[in-house]
């Protein structure tokens, strides 16, 4: 058995198939980890979601901001944006099956045996892994509860609060947790977010640092796999932290990492036009 991890697919199915064929991936024997953002902006969002769902017993995925956006649009909370490529999913006969599976996925995955954490955007420096898992579970519970789901989806949009406070309650609390796990790039040592800057390491606003670079980050010593930040092009220069989003949907490449051997495989992508997010 081999375990592989790959970055944001965003509806780019053919590069994933290329990589899985290259390593002779066999569902049922091997496992595939995904950093989230399975859909949107790419040309095959429906086909990608169906493909992943079809081998769901061999897949571990976390949710990204585009996956959550899909759920919000599907529940008539949010409208489709011009750059969205989600309409085929919304009109598909199996949409309910696919979307119900999607909302049961995690925000944060920890493989204790391997000592590896999987997340879409990152873990803020002021949270320990134990605390991060506990807070992720709060959002996961809201997503899986039919009575709470619409309120959560309606409240998750927005940047405030930009800083975590344990006294936060209700919608603001869940929004803050969601933004850390699915939208974060730069923050201060106390976790204050900058949610506007989307470029590389050199574009940090004054006083802000990439979330993984803070010297006192409480998850130091943990191996963390993350996506979301295509502008890093797979390079974050931080021991134990691995950036897997190499900008497939923007014409970069899709990267597949063998977690057992450390070997990387890449497949070039045609890409789609738009703004990173």
UniProtKB/Swiss-Prot annotation:
The signal peptide annotation in the UniProt record is none
Which catalysed reactions does the entry list for this protein?
P(1),P(4)-bis(5'-adenosyl) tetraphosphate + H2O = 2 ADP + 2 H(+)
| Database matches in Pfam families | Metallophos
Q: Which CDD domains match?
A: MPP_ApaH (cd07422)
GO function terms (MF aspect)? bis(5'-nucleosyl)-tetraphosphatase (symmetrical) activity
Which SUPFAM superfamilies does this UniProt record tie to the protein? Metallo-dependent phosphatases
Superkingdom to which the source organism belongs: Bacteria
So what EC number does this one have? 3.6.1.41
Q: Keywords assigned by UniProt? A: Hydrolase
Q: Supply the InterPro entries for this chain.
A: ApaH, Calcineurin-like_PHP_ApaH, Metallo-depent_PP-like
PANTHER family xref list: CYTOCHROME C5, PTHR40942
State the function annotated in the UniProt record. Answer: Hydrolyzes diadenosine 5',5'''-P1,P4-tetraphosphate to yield ADP.
Family assignment from sequence similarity: Belongs to the Ap4A hydrolase family.
Any idea what this protein is called?
A: Bis(5'-nucleosyl)-tetraphosphatase, symmetrical
Which organism does this record belong to? Azotobacter vinelandii (strain DJ / ATCC BAA-1303)
Q: What is the lineage of its organism?
A: Bacteria, Pseudomonadati, Pseudomonadota, Gammaproteobacteria, Pseudomonadales
């Amino acid at each position: 058995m081999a375990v592989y991890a790959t970055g944001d697919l965003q509806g780019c199915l053919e590069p994933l198939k290329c990589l899985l064929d290259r390593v002779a991936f066999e569902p049922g024997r091997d496992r595939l980890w995904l950093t989230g953002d399975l859909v949107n902006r790419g040309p095959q969002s429906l086909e990608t979601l169906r493909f992943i769902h079809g081998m769901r017993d061999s897949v571990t995925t976390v949710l990204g901001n585009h996956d959550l956006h899909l759920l919000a649009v599907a529940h008539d909370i949010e409208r489709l944006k011009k750059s969205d490529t989600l309409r085929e999913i919304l009109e598909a006969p199996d949409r309910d099956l696919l979307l119900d599976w999607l909302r049961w996925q995690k925000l944060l995955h920890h493989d204790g045996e391997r000592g590896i954490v999987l997340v879409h955007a990152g873990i803020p420096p002021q949270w320990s892994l134990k605390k991060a898992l506990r807070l992720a579970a709060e959002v996961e519970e809201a997503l899986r509860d039919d009575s709470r789901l619409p309120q959560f989806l309606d409240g998750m949009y927005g940047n405030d609060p930009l800083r975590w406070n344990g006294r936060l309650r209700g919608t603001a609390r869940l929004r803050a947790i969601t933004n850390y796990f699915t939208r974060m790039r730069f923050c201060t040592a106390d976790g204050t977010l900058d949610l506007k800057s989307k470029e590389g390491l050199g574009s940090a606003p004054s006083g802000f640092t990439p979330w993984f670079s803070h010297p006192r980050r409480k998850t130091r010593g943990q191996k963390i796999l993350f996506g979301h930040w295509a502008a890093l092009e797979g390079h974050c220069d931080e021991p134990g932290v691995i950036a897997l989003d190499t900008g497939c949907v923007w014409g970069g490449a899709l990267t597949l990492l063998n977690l057992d051997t450390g070997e990387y495989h890449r497949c070039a992508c045609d890409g789609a036009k738009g703004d990173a997010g």
